[in-house]
Amino acid sequence: MAFISSGYNPAKPMENRITDIGPRKFTEFFPPVIAKNAGNWDYHEILEPGILVHVAKNGDKVFTVRCGAARLMSTSHIREACEIAKKFCNGHLRFTTRNNIEFMVDNEETLKALVADLKTRKFAAGSFKFPIGGTGASISNIVHTQGWVYCHTPATDASGPVKAVMDELFEEFTSMRLPAIVRVSLACCINMCGAVHCSDIGLVGIHRKPPMIDHENLANLCEIPLAVAACPTAAVKPITAEVNGQKVKSVAINNDRCMYCG
Protein backbone atom coordinates (compact mmCIF):
# COMPACT_ATOMS: atom_id res chain seq x y z
CA MET A 1 0.00 0.00 0.00
CA ALA A 2 2.87 2.36 0.73
CA PHE A 3 4.20 1.96 -2.80
CA ILE A 4 0.74 2.49 -4.33
CA SER A 5 0.16 5.63 -2.27
CA SER A 6 3.46 7.05 -3.53
CA GLY A 7 2.38 6.66 -7.15
CA TYR A 8 3.58 3.14 -7.96
CA ASN A 9 1.26 1.29 -10.35
CA PRO A 10 1.54 -2.53 -10.05
CA ALA A 11 -0.08 -2.90 -13.47
CA LYS A 12 2.66 -0.76 -15.05
CA PRO A 13 5.78 -1.37 -12.95
CA MET A 14 8.11 0.52 -15.33
CA GLU A 15 6.00 3.68 -15.45
CA ASN A 16 7.82 6.72 -13.96
CA ARG A 17 10.51 4.41 -12.64
CA ILE A 18 13.67 6.11 -11.42
CA THR A 19 16.57 4.01 -12.69
CA ASP A 20 19.43 6.26 -11.64
CA ILE A 21 19.52 7.07 -7.93
CA GLY A 22 23.19 8.10 -7.84
CA PRO A 23 24.65 11.60 -8.24
CA ARG A 24 23.03 14.03 -10.66
CA LYS A 25 24.49 14.06 -14.16
CA PHE A 26 27.68 16.12 -14.15
CA THR A 27 26.65 18.16 -17.19
CA GLU A 28 23.98 19.85 -15.07
CA PHE A 29 26.74 21.67 -13.18
CA PHE A 30 28.60 23.10 -16.19
CA PRO A 31 28.94 26.87 -16.44
CA PRO A 32 26.88 28.08 -19.43
CA VAL A 33 29.91 28.72 -21.67
CA ILE A 34 31.24 25.19 -21.03
CA ALA A 35 27.83 23.59 -21.53
CA LYS A 36 27.44 25.47 -24.81
CA ASN A 37 30.81 24.39 -26.19
CA ALA A 38 31.22 20.91 -24.71
CA GLY A 39 33.19 18.81 -27.19
CA ASN A 40 33.93 21.80 -29.43
CA TRP A 41 37.06 23.30 -27.91
CA ASP A 42 39.82 24.34 -30.30
CA TYR A 43 42.84 24.95 -28.03
CA HIS A 44 43.93 26.20 -24.63
CA GLU A 45 46.81 28.29 -23.33
CA ILE A 46 48.38 29.13 -19.98
CA LEU A 47 48.35 32.92 -19.81
CA GLU A 48 50.35 33.08 -16.58
CA PRO A 49 50.88 30.79 -13.58
CA GLY A 50 47.47 29.57 -12.44
CA ILE A 51 45.47 31.23 -15.22
CA LEU A 52 44.32 29.35 -18.32
CA VAL A 53 42.13 30.17 -21.29
CA HIS A 54 40.21 27.62 -23.35
CA VAL A 55 39.03 28.79 -26.77
CA ALA A 56 36.11 27.15 -28.56
CA LYS A 57 35.86 26.70 -32.32
CA ASN A 58 33.23 29.46 -32.45
CA GLY A 59 35.52 31.90 -30.63
CA ASP A 60 33.98 31.63 -27.16
CA LYS A 61 36.50 31.74 -24.32
CA VAL A 62 36.51 30.51 -20.76
CA PHE A 63 39.18 31.74 -18.36
CA THR A 64 40.12 29.47 -15.47
CA VAL A 65 41.85 30.62 -12.28
CA ARG A 66 43.39 27.72 -10.37
CA CYS A 67 43.91 28.22 -6.63
CA GLY A 68 45.69 25.96 -4.20
CA ALA A 69 43.53 24.60 -1.41
CA ALA A 70 43.78 22.20 1.49
CA ARG A 71 42.47 18.65 1.29
CA LEU A 72 40.68 19.10 4.61
CA MET A 73 38.85 22.43 4.68
CA SER A 74 36.69 24.14 7.27
CA THR A 75 33.10 24.95 6.46
CA SER A 76 33.89 28.66 6.70
CA HIS A 77 36.60 28.29 4.04
CA ILE A 78 34.24 26.38 1.75
CA ARG A 79 31.58 29.06 2.23
CA GLU A 80 34.12 31.74 1.33
CA ALA A 81 35.00 29.86 -1.87
CA CYS A 82 31.29 29.65 -2.69
CA GLU A 83 30.93 33.36 -1.98
CA ILE A 84 33.68 34.11 -4.53
CA ALA A 85 32.05 31.81 -7.08
CA LYS A 86 28.70 33.51 -6.57
CA LYS A 87 30.25 36.97 -6.91
CA PHE A 88 32.28 36.37 -10.08
CA CYS A 89 31.32 33.00 -11.63
CA ASN A 90 27.52 32.82 -11.42
CA GLY A 91 27.88 30.29 -8.60
CA HIS A 92 30.08 27.81 -10.48
CA LEU A 93 33.36 26.35 -9.25
CA ARG A 94 35.11 23.02 -9.43
CA PHE A 95 37.69 21.02 -7.50
CA THR A 96 40.60 19.27 -9.22
CA THR A 97 41.97 15.85 -8.29
CA ARG A 98 44.92 17.55 -6.59
CA ASN A 99 42.76 19.60 -4.21
CA ASN A 100 42.81 22.82 -6.22
CA ILE A 101 39.79 25.10 -6.59
CA GLU A 102 39.10 26.44 -10.08
CA PHE A 103 37.01 29.54 -10.76
CA MET A 104 35.79 29.99 -14.35
CA VAL A 105 34.70 33.23 -16.04
CA ASP A 106 33.91 34.10 -19.66
CA ASN A 107 35.48 37.55 -20.09
CA GLU A 108 38.74 39.32 -19.29
CA GLU A 109 37.18 42.11 -17.23
CA THR A 110 35.70 39.64 -14.75
CA LEU A 111 38.97 37.69 -14.81
CA LYS A 112 40.97 40.74 -13.70
CA ALA A 113 38.47 41.55 -10.95
CA LEU A 114 38.51 37.92 -9.75
CA VAL A 115 42.31 37.75 -9.60
CA ALA A 116 42.50 41.08 -7.76
CA ASP A 117 39.93 39.87 -5.23
CA LEU A 118 41.72 36.56 -4.63
CA LYS A 119 45.03 38.33 -3.96
CA THR A 120 43.44 40.38 -1.17
CA ARG A 121 42.11 37.37 0.75
CA LYS A 122 44.65 36.38 3.40
CA PHE A 123 44.71 34.60 6.73
CA ALA A 124 45.52 36.49 9.92
CA ALA A 125 49.20 35.49 9.69
CA GLY A 126 49.45 36.89 6.16
CA SER A 127 49.37 33.78 3.96
CA PHE A 128 47.07 33.64 0.95
CA LYS A 129 43.75 31.88 1.38
CA PHE A 130 43.52 31.20 -2.36
CA PRO A 131 47.05 31.22 -3.83
CA ILE A 132 47.02 31.24 -7.64
CA GLY A 133 49.29 28.76 -9.43
CA GLY A 134 49.87 25.07 -10.04
CA THR A 135 49.84 25.12 -13.85
CA GLY A 136 52.49 24.32 -16.43
CA ALA A 137 56.09 23.77 -15.35
CA SER A 138 55.41 24.26 -11.66
CA ILE A 139 54.88 22.20 -8.53
CA SER A 140 51.26 21.19 -8.41
CA ASN A 141 49.34 21.08 -5.16
CA ILE A 142 50.32 18.26 -2.80
CA VAL A 143 47.82 15.45 -2.39
CA HIS A 144 47.90 13.39 0.78
CA THR A 145 46.11 10.64 2.63
CA GLN A 146 43.69 11.00 5.50
CA GLY A 147 46.02 11.35 8.46
CA TRP A 148 45.16 11.15 12.14
CA VAL A 149 41.91 13.06 11.74
CA TYR A 150 40.10 9.90 10.62
CA CYS A 151 42.28 6.93 9.64
CA HIS A 152 43.49 4.39 12.23
CA THR A 153 46.67 3.17 10.45
CA PRO A 154 48.84 6.26 9.82
CA ALA A 155 52.42 6.45 11.02
CA THR A 156 52.36 10.23 10.70
CA ASP A 157 49.82 12.97 10.28
CA ALA A 158 49.28 14.51 6.86
CA SER A 159 48.21 18.13 7.17
CA GLY A 160 51.22 19.31 9.19
CA PRO A 161 54.00 17.83 7.00
CA VAL A 162 52.18 18.89 3.83
CA LYS A 163 51.87 22.47 5.10
CA ALA A 164 55.57 22.52 6.03
CA VAL A 165 56.65 21.18 2.63
CA MET A 166 54.45 23.55 0.65
CA ASP A 167 55.67 26.51 2.70
CA GLU A 168 59.17 25.74 1.39
CA LEU A 169 58.01 25.08 -2.18
CA PHE A 170 55.42 27.84 -2.43
CA GLU A 171 57.41 29.93 -4.93
CA GLU A 172 57.50 26.97 -7.30
CA PHE A 173 53.70 26.69 -7.08
CA THR A 174 53.19 30.30 -8.14
CA SER A 175 55.78 30.28 -10.95
CA MET A 176 56.59 28.16 -14.01
CA ARG A 177 60.38 27.93 -14.06
CA LEU A 178 60.90 24.17 -13.64
CA PRO A 179 61.79 21.82 -16.53
CA ALA A 180 58.33 20.22 -16.27
CA ILE A 181 55.42 19.89 -13.88
CA VAL A 182 56.38 18.22 -10.59
CA ARG A 183 53.89 16.28 -8.49
CA VAL A 184 54.51 15.77 -4.78
CA SER A 185 52.37 13.48 -2.63
CA LEU A 186 52.36 12.26 0.96
CA ALA A 187 51.13 8.95 2.35
CA CYS A 188 50.75 8.51 6.09
CA CYS A 189 51.56 4.79 5.95
CA ILE A 190 52.69 2.14 3.48
CA ASN A 191 49.12 1.37 2.46
CA MET A 192 49.58 4.50 0.32
CA CYS A 193 45.94 5.20 -0.50
CA GLY A 194 47.12 8.55 -1.89
CA ALA A 195 49.00 6.81 -4.73
CA VAL A 196 52.31 8.47 -3.88
CA HIS A 197 54.08 5.86 -6.01
CA CYS A 198 52.54 7.62 -9.03
CA SER A 199 54.07 10.99 -8.12
CA ASP A 200 57.47 12.45 -8.90
CA ILE A 201 58.28 12.87 -5.20
CA GLY A 202 56.60 10.68 -2.61
CA LEU A 203 56.75 11.19 1.16
CA VAL A 204 55.78 8.03 3.05
CA GLY A 205 55.35 7.59 6.80
CA ILE A 206 56.42 4.16 8.03
CA HIS A 207 56.01 2.32 11.32
CA ARG A 208 59.35 1.13 12.70
CA LYS A 209 58.22 -0.85 15.75
CA PRO A 210 55.48 -3.35 16.55
CA PRO A 211 52.36 -1.77 18.09
CA MET A 212 52.14 -1.32 21.86
CA ILE A 213 49.11 -2.92 23.50
CA ASP A 214 46.90 -1.16 26.04
CA HIS A 215 45.41 -4.26 27.63
CA GLU A 216 43.17 -2.26 29.97
CA ASN A 217 41.29 -0.41 27.23
CA LEU A 218 41.74 -2.51 24.11
CA ALA A 219 38.45 -4.40 24.36
CA ASN A 220 36.59 -1.10 24.65
CA LEU A 221 38.33 0.46 21.66
CA CYS A 222 38.02 -2.23 18.99
CA GLU A 223 36.52 -5.62 18.24
CA ILE A 224 39.25 -8.12 19.03
CA PRO A 225 38.20 -10.74 16.41
CA LEU A 226 38.35 -8.07 13.71
CA ALA A 227 41.75 -6.87 14.92
CA VAL A 228 43.05 -10.44 14.72
CA ALA A 229 41.52 -11.03 11.28
CA ALA A 230 42.87 -7.74 9.92
CA CYS A 231 46.52 -8.72 10.35
CA PRO A 232 47.93 -9.82 6.96
CA THR A 233 50.72 -11.92 8.50
CA ALA A 234 48.80 -13.48 11.41
CA ALA A 235 51.01 -11.65 13.89
CA VAL A 236 48.07 -10.78 16.16
CA LYS A 237 46.47 -13.40 18.38
CA PRO A 238 43.81 -13.16 21.10
CA ILE A 239 44.86 -13.63 24.70
CA THR A 240 43.51 -13.16 28.21
CA ALA A 241 45.62 -10.60 30.05
CA GLU A 242 45.64 -9.70 33.73
CA VAL A 243 45.20 -6.01 34.60
CA ASN A 244 44.98 -4.87 38.24
CA GLY A 245 44.13 -8.38 39.34
CA GLN A 246 41.35 -8.78 36.78
CA LYS A 247 41.37 -10.87 33.63
CA VAL A 248 40.55 -8.98 30.43
CA LYS A 249 40.39 -9.95 26.79
CA SER A 250 43.24 -8.55 24.74
CA VAL A 251 45.74 -9.43 22.02
CA ALA A 252 49.43 -10.25 21.78
CA ILE A 253 51.84 -9.42 18.96
CA ASN A 254 54.32 -11.84 17.43
CA ASN A 255 57.14 -9.39 16.78
CA ASP A 256 58.92 -11.73 14.37
CA ARG A 257 55.88 -11.86 12.11
CA CYS A 258 54.88 -8.19 12.36
CA MET A 259 55.32 -6.16 9.16
CA TYR A 260 54.60 -2.79 10.87
CA CYS A 261 51.58 -1.97 8.72
CA GLY A 262 49.89 0.07 11.43
Swiss-Prot record:
Q: Where does [4Fe-4S] cluster 1 bind?
A: C151, C188, C189, C193
Please write the reaction equations for the catalytic activity of this protein.
[DsrC protein]-trisulfide + NAD(+) + 3 H2O = [DsrC protein]-dithiol + sulfite + NADH + 3 H(+)
Residues recorded as binding [4Fe-4S] cluster 2, renumbered to this chain, are C231, C258, C261
Q: Which UniProt keywords apply?
A: 4Fe-4S, Iron, Iron-sulfur, Metal-binding, Oxidoreductase
Tree of life domain: Bacteria
Q: Which cysteines are joined by disulfide bonds?
A: none
Which cofactors are reported in the record for this sequence?
Answer: [4Fe-4S] cluster; siroheme
Q: How is the cofactor bound?
A: Binds 2 [4Fe-4S] clusters per subunit.
The residues listed in the UniProt record as binding siroheme, with positions renumbered to this chain, are C193
The record's GO molecular-function terms, alphabetically, read:
4 iron, 4 sulfur cluster binding; dissimilatory sulfite reductase (NADH) activity; heme binding; metal ion binding
Q: EC no.? A: 1.8.1.22
Point out the signal peptide segment.
none
Q: What does this protein do?
A: Catalyzes the reduction of sulfite to sulfide. This is the terminal oxidation reaction in sulfate respiration, a process catalyzed by the sulfate-reducing bacteria.
Can you state the subunit structure given in the record? Heterohexamer of two alpha, two beta and two gamma subunits.
Protein name from the UniProt record: Sulfite reductase, dissimilatory-type subunit beta
Q: What is the organism lineage in this UniProt record? A: Bacteria, Pseudomonadati, Thermodesulfobacteriota, Desulfovibrionia, Desulfovibrionales
Q: Which gene encodes it?
A: dsrB
